[in-house]
C-alpha cells in the first residue's frame, strides 16, 4: 500500500508532554480486532479522549480546538509497551504525519516508518523548547525536512538534525512501502536472477 510522499512538512503541532506513553494508551487492546488499517484514528488515545459514556473529556489535548496540526509532539519513551502496529495505524489514521519525541520505543518507531509516519527523535533540550514554544503560542509551527533530516522551530529558527535509516528515508520520500519498493526495482531483480548460474 503506497502512502503520501514525505518531503518537507510544515505544520503546527499537538503537544502531549507525557512520558512513557505506551501502545495500550495509544490504542486500547479492545479495538485491535479489525484487520484493515482504516478507522483506528477514531480510537486514538481512546481512554484519554472519552469518558465511560463516550462523551469527550474536554481537558484532553485532542479535544481542545486550540491545538491542531499534522505533527504530534510526545514525551520521552513514546510508543513503549507491547508490539502492536495498530498503534501506528491509529496515529496515521487520525491525521498525524510525524511524531516528535526525545526517545521512541524501537518497535513503534519501526511500525511508524512502515506506514508513512515519520518518527523524529530530538534531544531532550530541543523537545523542551518545542513544548515551551507551543505553550506560549499554540499556532507555533515546526518544519520537518526529510531530505535534509532536520527539524526547525520556526518561531526561533532553531534547528536540529535527526537520524533515519536510509532505506526507510528513501521509501518515505517516494511514498513507498516495502512491496512498492520491490515492485519499483522489479527489472533489476529479474536481471540479477537471470544471471545466476542455477
For the regions a language model picked out, list residue spans one by one.
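Cytosolic catalytic domains that perform sulfur/thiol-centered chemistry
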Residues: 1-198
Amino acid at each position: 500500500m503506497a502512502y503520501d510522499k514525505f518531503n518537507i512538512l510544515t505544520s503546527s503541532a499537538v503537544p502531549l508532554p507525557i512520558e512513557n506513553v505506551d501502545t495500550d494508551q495509544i490504542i486500547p487492546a479492545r479495538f485491535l480486532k479489525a484487520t484493515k488499517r482504516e478507522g483506528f484514528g477514531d480510537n486514538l488515545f481512546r481512554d484519554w479522549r472519552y469518558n465511560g459514556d463516550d462523551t469527550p473529556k474536554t481537558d484532553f489535548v485532542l479535544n481542545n480546538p486550540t491545538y491542531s496540526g499534522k505533527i504530534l509532539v510526545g514525551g520521552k519513551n513514546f510508543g513503549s509497551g507491547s508490539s502492536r502496529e495498530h498503534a501506528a495505524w491509529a496515529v496515521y489514521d487520525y491525521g498525524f504525519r510525524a511524531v516528535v519525541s526525545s526517545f521512541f520505543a524501537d518497535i513503534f518507531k519501526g511500525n511508524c516508518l512502515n506506514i508513512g509516519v515519520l518518527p523524529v527523535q530530538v534531544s531532550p533540550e530541543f523537545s523542551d523548547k518545542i513544548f515551551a514554544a507551543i505553550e506560549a503560542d499554540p499556532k507555533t509551527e515546526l518544519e520537518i525536512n526529510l531530505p535534509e533530516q532536520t527539524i526547525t522551530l520556526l518561531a526561533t529558527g532553531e534547528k536540529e538534525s535527526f537520524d533515519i535509516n536510509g532505506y526507510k528515508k528513501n521509501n518515505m520520500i517516494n511514498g513507498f512501502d516495502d512491496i512498492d519498493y520491490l515492485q519499483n526495482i522489479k527489472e533489476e531483480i529479474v536481471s540479477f536472477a537471470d544471471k545466476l548460474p542455477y
